[in-house]
Curated annotation (Swiss-Prot):
It comes from the Eukaryota. One of its GO terms (molecular function) is RNA binding. One of its GO terms (cellular component) is early endosome. Its main location: other. Transmembrane segments: none annotated. This is Protein phosphatase 1 regulatory subunit 21. Component of the FERRY complex. Residues 1-84, 125-206, 426-477, 586-627 form a coiled coil. Component of the FERRY complex (Five-subunit Endosomal Rab5 and RNA/ribosome intermediary). The FERRY complex directly interacts with mRNAs and RAB5A, and functions as a RAB5A effector involved in the localization and the distribution of specific mRNAs most likely by mediating their endosomal transport. The complex recruits mRNAs and ribosomes to early endosomes through direct mRNA-interaction. Putative regulator of protein phosphatase 1 (PP1) activity. May play a role in the endosomal sorting process or in endosome maturation pathway. It comes from Danio rerio (Zebrafish). Coiled-coil domains of PPP1R21 are essential for RNA binding. Keywords: Coiled coil, Endosome, RNA-binding. InterPro entries: PPP1R21, PPP1R21_C, PPP1R21_N, PPP1R21_six_helix. The gene is ppp1r21.
């Protein structure tokens, strides 16, 4: 049973471990799902940011194309203006040459700006190609990560399904165990009811059998004494039966009588001594009359009665000592030493208590500094070196105590951690206690069931045996009645004693011969009824013991076979659960490794995205700066072109005026 209980406890521990691992795996699955959701959210954010960047790139490319077209138009206008200026240069005078030189300077600046714009445009195209390549790489990498995340999600779903299956099976096992427990409780109740009924019947039969046995034994003791038919001289050697209960009862009665007699003797002695003292003192104190002869005789009788009472007490004490056995007592030296030790301990406690009260009452006076004041002013005397050293030590101790403590965990965080720890430990301990209590209850109920089943079987066997024994006793009593009548008639007629005895012997030898041959293999049989009863009771007790041992053996063998089958089933289940747990642990380790790799890759992808965002922001800023510079330059070029047009128009007007003047001349 102890091995089974240990194995059941091991199975319960493994079940609790599996439940704890299942909870951990559930938490891991939830964490993985939350991490996958967060990764999906981050991916959506990154896609939105990429779309924004692409839109900005498209807008910038469109703006750049517009600027290129504007520059081309300006270049064409510049070429036209240059051609016109060349034509007018051939016709114009020296002031037009100065303007042409200025125009050539502006043209050179414009040509440099155009070259710089082309170079920047080429760099922008290269950067755009690099950005597209990196975007393609990141998109492929993102697709790969999405596929891996889907695989990881599938693995997590598979693990969750398996754990749900295991949980379902464990819940079914728990339900079956509860059903078994309820059935066992019902069977235990039924067995209790049956055993109570059997016990009541057994008590009733025992009372009936005991009453009949008492009656038959009294009849046998009174009517059928031990009588040796062969040698009558042996009848004088009969020894009375030994009764231990009677001796114990006699000892108790003697002890009680001794106590009562001691009390009575002491009371009588006190009464007699005080009465004698009063009788003798009263006349002498009053000095009225002398002691009468009656009082003197009464005091003499009291003295004699006291001597008799003391002798009676001593004799009864010797009787009690002869009956009882004295236990070894402690020596006088040990008792005196113990009393001295107790007295010294009491004196020590009292003296220490007095010292404590003394110091507590005079603490203020002892701590105050002693001084003297000869002329009104308090003068403090010099203190001893030992007092100064003790003060220094006290100051050092106070300084060491007042040192700042090291930083610790904040109080709120510590309370939260303690609450979490206590809740987790309480839940775990509560579950463990529930499991242990249920196991103990199951084992206790099984033991009670087995016990009551065995008791019921034994009670049935006892009932059968007692019924058979009652029948045998009734038959024997019926047989013994005519024998007692024959003995009585033989006692009345002394002449026919030998003939009656011979007839009784023949009848007694003939009647018990058949059951003796059937039950006992012994060749010699007792002719008396007492011998037959004793032999039958011994055979019945041995048969009862054999049947009881056989029943117990068969019951325990069947129970051991059942428990071995249950143990084999539990071992197979435990092996299966252990294999599943190992597989789940391996998959969990693989999932954790894949999660770590995915986390690292996600970190790298985030780093690349942040780097690209930084590069994009820098390129965007540079392009914005360049566009602002180009816009400023175009504004300045427009202003110069407008000024040049104005100068060209003025030159044209002046040229026309000069031509008209020349024509008029």
């Amino acid at each position: 049973m102890t091995d089974l209980q240990s194995k059941y406890s091991k199975l319960a521990q493994e079940y609790s471990k599996l439940r704890a691992q299942n909870q951990v795996l559930k938490k891991a699955v939830v964490d993985e799902q939350s991490s996958c959701n967060s990764l999906k959210d981050e991916l959506k954010q990154k896609e939105q940011s990429l779309r924004r960047v692409e839109q900005e790139m498209d807008s910038l490319s469109f703006r750049n194309q517009q600027l290129m077209k504007r520059v081309e138009l300006l270049q064409e206008e510049l070429l036209l203006s240059e051609s016109k200026s060349k034509k007018s240069r051939s016709k114009g005078d020296s002031p037009s040459q100065v303007s042409l030189q200025a125009q050539s300077v502006f043209d050179e600046d414009l040509h440099k700006k155009i070259q710089e714009n082309e170079r920047l445009h080429i760099q922008w195209l290269e950067a755009q190609e690099q950005h597209q390549q990196q975007e393609a790489q990141l998109s492929s990498r993102l697709q790969q990560l999405q596929e891996e995340a889907q695989e990881h999600q599938a693995q997590l779903e598979e693990l969750s399904c398996r754990h749900a299956h295991t949980i379902h099976t464990l819940q079914e096992d728990k339900a079956t165990l509860e059903v078994k427990l309820q059935t066992l409780e019902r069977e235990a109740r039924d067995c209790r009811v049956r055993t109570e009924e059997c016990q009541q019947q057994l008590r009733k039969y025992q009372s009936e059998v005991s009453s009949q046995l008492k009656h038959s034994s009294s009849v046998i003791q009174e009517k059928v004494p031990f009588n040796d038919t062969q040698l009558s001289d042996y009848n004088s050697l009969n020894v009375p039966a030994h009764n231990r209960r009677h001796q114990l009862r006699a000892r108790e009665v003697a002890a009680q009588a001794l106590v009562f007699l001691q009390n009575l003797v002491s009371a009588l002695l006190n009464f007699h001594s005080y009465s004698e003292q009063r009788v003798q003192i009263y006349p002498r104190d009053s000095s009225i009359e002398t002691i009468s002869a009656v009082n003197q005789k009464f005091s003499q009788y009291l003295h004699e009665n006291a001597s008799y009472l003391r002798q009676l007490e001593e004799d009864l004490l010797q009787l009690h000592q002869s009956i009882t056995e004295d236990l070894p007592a402690a020596t006088q030296k040990f008792c005196t030493t113990n009393e001295c030790l107790l007295s010294s301990l009491a004196s020590l406690t009292s003296s220490s208590g007095k010292m404590a009260t003394f110091f507590s009452n005079s603490l203020d006076f002892l701590t105050s500094c002693a001084g003297y004041s000869p002329s009104g002013a308090l003068l403090k005397p010099l203190q001893a070196d030992s007092v100064m050293q003790s003060k220094r030590r006290a100051a050092a101790y106070i300084s060491s105590v007042r040192q700042a403590r090291a930083e610790s965990v904040p109080y709120g965080e510590a309370l939260a951690n303690r609450h979490i720890l206590t809740s987790s430990t309480e839940s775990r301990e509560g579950l463990m206690q529930q499991v242990l209590q249920s196991q103990q209850k199951i084992s206790r109920l099984e033991q009670e069931k087995e016990h009551w089943l065995l008791e019921a079987q034994l009670a049935q066997v006892r009932l059968q045996k007692e019924s058979a024994r009652i029948a045998q006793l009734e038959a024997q009593v019926c047989v013994s009645a005519p024998q007692s009548q024959l003995c009585a008639s033989a006692a009345e007629s002394p002449v026919c004693v030998s003939a009656a005895e011979s007839q009784v012997c023949v009848s007694a030898a003939e009647t018990p011969s058949e059951p003796a041959l059937a039950d006992a293999p012994e060749p010699l049989q007792d002719t008396s009824v007492v011998g037959v009863l004793s032999i039958r009771s011994c055979s019945e007790s041995s048969a009862d013991q054999d049947s009881r041992e056989q029943l117990i053996k068969t019951h325990y063998m069947s129970r051991v076979s059942e428990l071995t089958t249950q143990l084999q089933i539990c071992d197979s289940k435990a092996v299966h659960f252990h294999a599943e747990c190992r597989a789940v642990a391996k998959r969990l380790a693989m999932a954790e490794r894949s999660r770590d790799t995915l986390g690292e890759e996600l970190k790298l992808a985030n780093q690349n995205i942040t780097r690209l965002q930084d590069e994009l922001s820098t390129t965007k800023r540079s392009y914005e700066d360049q566009l602002s510079m180009m816009s400023d330059h175009l504004c300045s070029m427009n202003e110069t072109l407008s000024q040049q047009r104005e100068t060209i128009d003025t030159l044209k007007l002046s040229a026309k005026g000069n031509a008209k003047k020349n024509k008029s001349r």
